[in-house]
A protein has these predicted regions:
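A conserved SF2-helicase RecA2
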Residues: 152, 184-190, 194-238
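Helicase motor interdomain insertion/brace
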Residues: 1-125, 140, 146-149, 162, ...
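Short, flexible/disordered intra-domain loops and linkers
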Residues: 128-138
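SF2 helicase motor core recognition
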Residues: 156-171, 191-198
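Secondary-structure transition/capping motifs at alpha-helix termini
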Residues: 112-117, 181, 196-201
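Amphipathic, heptad-repeat alpha-helical coiled-coil/stalk segments that mediate oligomerization
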Residues: 137-138, 142-143, 176-177, 183-190, ...
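A short beta-strand element within the Helicase C-terminal
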Residues: 164-179, 188, 203-207
């Protein structure tokens, strides 16, 4: 669980480790932590009491992640592709499995490189909205979709849980901030923009993962599995 959150972003890993320290043993709180997972095998009922040694490890993990929060390499790569490679001009959707990661990325971009650029956050549980100049204003998801279609929004950051059935052919590029362990979900992310009505002949996709991490190995396995699935069935439907 913690490795998966850390594989998404440093902030998601830090927040999860801190919540685990504070809430372990609180079944309701732990179910909230697990709510965004795409792996049904991870269940709160399987969690035993935390040992003193494990608590110490979590405390060290939180401290280490805190020390590195301002230097997340994924952020630098996202900025490079949006700005230097001009993906923002083509329209871009960024997917993350976790709201913590989506909100963090939108806020950092809005405070720094993308000041005065409206950034959409597309999520569930009434957490969708617009980030502008570092400030967040809640908006309905239908409003965000219309803003993308009209060209008012060039950048949308969405979570998997909220994005089923999302059709955004106006956007021409996709960044996977993290990688779901279910290969079908990874393919369906691309399907949000690679649809009838897409004006670009090719859709550019960037998959981000930390080198040497568990996510790096997952990417290798997903690539192999997706290739096998495409060979058998073609593009995966929604």
């Amino acid at each position: 669980l913690l490795l998966r959150r850390m594989g998404s972003s440093i902030i998601a890993g830090r927040n999860t480790a801190q919540k685990m320290l504070n809430e372990w043993g609180n079944d309701e709180a732990m179910e909230g932590i697990l709510g965004e997972e795409d792996d049904d095998s991870i269940e709160s009922s399987s969690m035993r009491d935390i040992t003193p040694a494990e608590r110490t490890e979590l405390e060290l993990t939180v401290a280490a992640l805190n020390d590195n929060m301002s230097a997340d390499p994924k952020y630098k790569i996202v900025v490079e592709y949006l700005m230097q490679k001009k993906w923002l001009e083509l329209g871009c959707i960024i997917f993350s499995q976790y709201y913590d990661s989506a909100y963090w990325l939108a806020e950092e971009l809005s405070k720094n490189e993308l000041k005065s650029e409206a950034i959409g956050i597309y999520a569930g549980n009434n957490r969708s909205g617009i980030m502008l100049d570092g400030y967040f204003q809640r908006k309905e998801r239908d409003t965000l979709k219309q803003m993308v279609r009209s060209g008012e929004l060039r950048l949308l950051i969405g979570t998997d849980a909220a994005s089923e059935g999302l059709n955004l052919q106006r956007l021409g590029t996709l960044i996977n901030l993290d990688l779901p362990w279910n290969p079908t979900k990874l393919e369906q992310r691309k399907g949000r923009i690679q649809r009838i009505g897409q004006t670009r002949e090719t859709v550019d996709v960037l998959n981000l993962r930390y080198r040497g991490s568990v996510e790096d190995r997952v990417h290798q396995l997903l690539s192999s599995r997706l290739e096998s699935i495409r060979d058998m069935f073609g593009q995966i439907p929604d």
